[in-house]
Amino acid sequence: MAQSVKTMVEGGKATTGPPIGPALGPLGLNVAQVVKEINEKTKEFQGMRVPVTITVVDPETKKYEITVGIPPTSALLKKKLGIEKGAAKRKEAIAGNATLDQIVDVAKTKMASMLASDLKAATLEVLGTCVSMGINVDGKDPKEVQRQIKAGEISI
């Protein structure tokens, strides 16, 4: 039976220490080799935490597979806008201002892992994350942009 280890790692910066080392040690895998492979596969997500799943396909031969997920929407938005974090009190402070093109770009990246059926729905979902992070879109409240998209005033 295949065993899996799921963890979040910073892109390109996984180490043999916790959480990976202790989780893989009992499975008999070469931890250094696995970490090297994880870092290679996650280097494009430098500075972001990404979900990684290591699945031991064959315990006897120590064959394994590494699956790298897509970072959380909030991490993609922070990287896209070059901000450290969202606003603590979104009604009082604005963490950043994104363009609609940036929001659509994040939606395209995340679409495969979302429940959204099309780009419009995915964009609305990313705008929802903007609401909670205190990020305006083209200088407007993201709720207003969502309303405009739903009303057909803005087409995606």
Swiss-Prot record:
This is Large ribosomal subunit protein uL11. Forms part of the ribosomal stalk which helps the ribosome interact with GTP-bound translation factors. Residues 1-20 are annotated as: Disordered. Gene3D superfamilies: Ribosomal protein L11, C-terminal domain, Ribosomal protein L11/L12, N-terminal domain. GO terms for cellular component: large ribosomal subunit. Coiled coil: none annotated. GO terms for biological process: translation. NCBIfam families: PRK01143.1. PANTHER family: 60S RIBOSOMAL PROTEIN L12, LARGE RIBOSOMAL SUBUNIT PROTEIN UL11M. HAMAP family: Ribosomal_uL11 (MF_00736). The keyword Kinase does not apply. SMART domains: RL11. Part of the ribosomal stalk of the 50S ribosomal subunit. Interacts with L10 and the large rRNA to form the base of the stalk. L10 forms an elongated spine to which L12 dimers bind in a sequential fashion forming a multimeric L10(L12)X complex. Keywords: Ribonucleoprotein, Ribosomal protein, RNA-binding, rRNA-binding. GO terms for molecular function: large ribosomal subunit rRNA binding; structural constituent of ribosome. Belongs to the universal ribosomal protein uL11 family.
